[in-house]
């Protein structure tokens, strides 16, 4: 029961409305981000609004870099 309450609290603080507002992610990108960067209960319970927002922004920068690397064409490193 305690674990369920903790998960609800994390979901309450780390929610799609807040993440969308800060990151401008939508749809599949938003869903993937929310799963990949979901914070722990310990972090969320100790973080104030500013710290949580900064966490989300920092993670969004990492996520955007990951997306760019995935979308970048594979470069051939051998010269002809």
What function would you assign to each model-found segment?
Residues 1-80:
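Short beta-strand and adjacent turn/loop elements
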